[in-house]
């Protein structure tokens, strides 16, 4: 038997049927799905050095299980003391099984470790069915060794869905188990 991550199995066996039932799709191909998860981590340019960049890349690689790349600035910006070609952020795009494994670890392990966590903001959709989640500290992930961590950067996690409507995407992420804030738990 082949390995299948828990959220992917859940999607195939239960979520598709619940989405068809709720939104009355005529075909299984109309059902929205999670296309990719993009993790972006900005780096403070003022403390930039190669060691900082390499540590940040190693941390994101440990969290996601996939090698991260750095993004370079496109132009000079004197207000930020930024030069063209300077690394300003790190990103990694997750697809297929690695995406589902990361989603499982995020929902079941990392988010419950956030101090005073009451749920994620339900208004962070972009109007195209994509959801953005900001995390202020990367130490919520158990893969990060807090003893050797010098710079604790935050990160932005974007869930890209095939849905074009926020309502459908929100219900899809809710069925995956993403804990949205409700009036009860605030």
Curated annotation (Swiss-Prot):
Q: Which SUPFAM superfamilies match?
A: RL5-like
List, in alphabetical order, the GO biological process terms annotated in this UniProt record.
translation
For this record, the Gene Ontology CC terms, alphabetical, are:
ribonucleoprotein complex; ribosome
- Which keywords describe this protein according to UniProt? Ribonucleoprotein, Ribosomal protein, RNA-binding, rRNA-binding, tRNA-binding
Q: Which GO terms describe its molecular function?
A: rRNA binding; structural constituent of ribosome; tRNA binding
**Taxonomically, which superkingdom?**
Bacteria
Q: Which residues cross the membrane?
A: none
User: Quaternary state and partners of this protein?
Assistant: Part of the 50S ribosomal subunit; part of the 5S rRNA/L5/L18/L25 subcomplex. Contacts the 5S rRNA and the P site tRNA. Forms a bridge to the 30S subunit in the 70S ribosome.
What role does this protein play?
This is one of the proteins that bind and probably mediate the attachment of the 5S RNA into the large ribosomal subunit, where it forms part of the central protuberance. In the 70S ribosome it contacts protein S13 of the 30S subunit (bridge B1b), connecting the 2 subunits; this bridge is implicated in subunit movement. Contacts the P site tRNA; the 5S rRNA and some of its associated proteins might help stabilize positioning of ribosome-bound tRNAs.
Entries under NCBIfam families matching the protein: PRK00010.1 (NF000585)
- What family does the database annotate? Belongs to the universal ribosomal protein uL5 family.
- Protein name as annotated: Large ribosomal subunit protein uL5
Q: Which organism is it from?
A: Karelsulcia muelleri (strain GWSS)
